[in-house]
């Protein structure tokens, strides 16, 4: 049986986004504990996202005009079950990366509550990178930030979704992979929703997961503290 990996977080997604999905084919079905679970496909190979569990719950949410439903995202690992290296090394992991076929609408403040951002971007620290190859002077930083701000202040463009990678950090914790500046501006502009595309590759070996979860939580806390103090 293929290894089914689950997101570390539950995401409050617009129920209309989930209702639009077809049910997961019988040959890919696996038992899951969460009421609503979406199995992401692979946009590059034409595999579509499907609803693994929770059709009735989604219908109820639509009938009740609920603004969101809690969704667990799942994927089949592209990395071998006993591969103890690839999931921890970004260049290796990138070879196996898949992207969801659909985008999903989530309130940006709800994403922030999940504590999955690796950096909190504001006007003050926009386009400041530790890598000197990506150095921008003050004028260029301001220009780029203002350009992005002006393009977003009237609404979020779904053509530029955030990339949230499932189990990105140490194969155990979801994090925002791309889109930190968009997240910051969406919150600054009080946008109700942002578009999110999920990506994935693999998960840490199960025997290591309890320890790695503790390390990952400490890691992201320290990363945010160091970058935003």
Label every PLM stretch briefly.
Residues 212-213, 226-229:
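Conserved double-stranded beta-helix
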Residues 1-4:
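Non-Sec secretion/translocation targeting segments of pathogen effectors
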Residues 7:
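Glycine/charge-rich catalytic "coupling/switch" loops of P-loop NTPases
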